[in-house]
Amino acid sequence: MSKIDKASRRQKIKDRSRFSVAGTQEKPRLCVYRSLSQIYAQLIDDSGKKTIMAVSSMSKENKELKGSKTEVCHRVGKQIAEKALANGITNVVFDRNGFRYHGRIKALADGAREAGLIF
């Protein structure tokens, strides 16, 4: 599968799932983006069109993280969950953004669930 096919496949899945995945103020959307070496997670309120909070593997508290990419993703998932719980958010809608639920995406989701987020 060529790189163009992978990108267009992910975009189609992302567009298709956007109809069923929407966040509100009470239950925001946990949107995940995975680049080649980094991971980004955001809590988004789609009704107000605002990002509530964001954590990435490049943020200041994560600069010194050691370990594999999967372990770093697990820690990022725990951090976004801890921030959400501190703001009173317990339920979220998980948006994998067209990526397969496998590897680093799954590690982030598992970390968020372990820290107490419900989805």
Curated annotation (Swiss-Prot):
GO terms for cellular component: cytosolic large ribosomal subunit. Pfam families: Ribosomal_L18p. GO terms for molecular function: 5S rRNA binding; structural constituent of ribosome. InterPro entries: Ribosomal_uL18_bac-type, Ribosomal_uL18_bac/euk. Keywords: Ribonucleoprotein, Ribosomal protein, RNA-binding, rRNA-binding. GO terms for biological process: translation. Signal peptide: none annotated. The keyword Ribonucleoprotein applies. The keyword Protease does not apply. Belongs to the universal ribosomal protein uL18 family. This is one of the proteins that bind and probably mediate the attachment of the 5S RNA into the large ribosomal subunit, where it forms part of the central protuberance. Part of the 50S ribosomal subunit; part of the 5S rRNA/L5/L18/L25 subcomplex. Contacts the 5S and 23S rRNAs. This is Large ribosomal subunit protein uL18.
